[in-house]
């Protein structure tokens, strides 16, 4: 689905206090504005956070989105609780964005990826900041998991990690190569099937390799107790980085479903606890009948909303981010998104783009995948 930038110039009013009331509202609105060409006004930014308003990494997302479409923006400053964003056409090209210290590169990348992937032209992004930081998908989650599911939908790009950036030093760098011209397909994922494989990564940066080995041993011990018939494979790596940090990431591959969970190290946090964090999250997913983990369910909503037809999948858990993202998407697109389950429980998610788009809207049609 592509929407001409000349159409639908009515300003969309977005309440930043909706749903979980955090940065998700802002990032979703920015992506949708780039995709549809529709301007928006966002008020009460991050109203439910201890420090409301734009923080540095949120401002970086606004400025990055504005740069790729030459947008006119008002209110783009630290602490601002309201912005107005009027986009121009998305311009493929080479861009560099410095998020600052340990600001999450993944969140800015996810804001820009789909608009650039659907644009007619090649783009390259370089983002500097945090690559493995709390409250955001780490780089390896994006590369091992998110990227592959988007490719299954017909959205193609490549990622590379030049330097890891852990909290609080940051200083990492991620590069994305986006060929452009992607046309998202619909997706049917209702039955996860049987577990085929568990792969993992235990990595350290500027810390003894033995810490990564301890993380690996604990994860393998726990996984073999939980899943006696499984043969997990976890590799150990030392990542180049400015600061210090650790990560333990697990990817479960099922017949049709897929889930990725990870734990991050922190001062005073034992290596075994990092592994337990990832294993506990993966075990919770495997106890459900979900086809995707709760984080991916949230991240797939927008690509599915831009797809050519109805999609359905099952999440292992309904999260506030999922419901918030759905609410913002409904403001910009004539679409039905049904989440058939309560907060915190597994649920079916159905995404139905409009069968008859409004005047000026063009929908590109392709087949679905299952």
Residue ranges and their predicted role:
Residues 23-43, 53-54:
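N-terminal glycine-rich anion-binding loops that anchor highly charged ligand groups
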Residues 303-370:
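Internal helix-turn-beta structural module
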Residues 10-33, 368:
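N-terminal basic/disordered segments at the start of proteins
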Residues 135, 185, 191-294, 312:
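Conserved mixed alpha/beta catalytic, RNA-binding, or beta-rich assembly cores of soluble enzyme
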Residues 59-160, 175:
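A generic, well-ordered mixed alpha/beta core segment in the N-terminal half of proteins
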Residues 86, 90-92, 98-105, 118, ...:
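Phosphate/diphosphate-binding glycine-rich loops and adjacent basic-rich segments that engage nucleotide
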Residues 134-137, 161-175, 235-244:
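Beta-rich nucleic-acid/ligand-interaction surfaces
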Residues 72-76, 122-123, 156-164, 223-242, ...:
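Flexible, glycine/charged-enriched surface loops at secondary-structure junctions
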């Amino acid at each position: 689905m592509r929407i001409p930038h000349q159409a639908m110039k009515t300003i969309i009013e977005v309440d930043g206090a909706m749903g979980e009331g955090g940065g998700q509202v802002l990032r979703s609105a920015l992506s949708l504005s780039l995709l549809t060409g529709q301007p928006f006004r966002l008020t009460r930014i991050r109203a439910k956070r201890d420090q409301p308003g734009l923080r540095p990494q949120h401002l970086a997302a606004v400025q990055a989105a504005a740069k790729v479409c030459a947008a006119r923006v008002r209110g783009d400053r630290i602490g601002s609780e309201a912005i107005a964003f009027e986009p121009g056409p998305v311009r493929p090209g080479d861009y560099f964005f410095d998020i600052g210290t340990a600001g999450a590169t993944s969140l800015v990348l996810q804001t820009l990826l789909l608009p650039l992937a659907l644009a007619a032209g090649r783009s390259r992004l370089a983002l500097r900041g945090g690559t493995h930081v709390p409250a955001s998908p780490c780089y390896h989650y994006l590369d091992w998991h998110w990227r592959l599911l988007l490719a299954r939908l017909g959205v193609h790009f490549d990622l590379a990690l030049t330097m890891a950036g852990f909290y609080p030093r940051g200083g990492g760098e991620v590069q994305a190569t986006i060929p452009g011209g992607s046309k998202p397909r619909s997706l049917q994922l209702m039955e996860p099937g049987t577990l085929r494989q568990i792969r993992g990564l235990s990595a350290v940066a500027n810390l003894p390799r033995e810490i990564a080995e301890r993380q690996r041993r604990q994860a393998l011990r726990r996984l073999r107790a939980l899943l006696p018939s499984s043969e997990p494979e976890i590799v150990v790596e030392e990542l180049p980085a400015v600061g210090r940090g650790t990560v333990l990431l697990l990817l479960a591959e099922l017949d049709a479903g897929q889930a990725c969970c990870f734990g991050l190290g922190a001062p005073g946090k034992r290596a075994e606890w990092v592994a337990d964090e990832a294993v506990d999250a993966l075990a919770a997913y495997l106890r459900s009948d979900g086809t995707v983990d709760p984080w991916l369910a949230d991240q797939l909503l927008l690509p599915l909303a831009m797809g050519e037809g109805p999609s359905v999948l099952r999440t292992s858990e309904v999260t506030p981010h999922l419901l918030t993202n759905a609410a913002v998407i409904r403001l910009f697109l004539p679409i039905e998104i049904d989440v058939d389950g309560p907060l915190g429980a597994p649920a079916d998610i159905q995404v139905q783009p409009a069968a008859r788009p409004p005047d000026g809207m063009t929908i590109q049609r392709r087949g679905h995948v299952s």
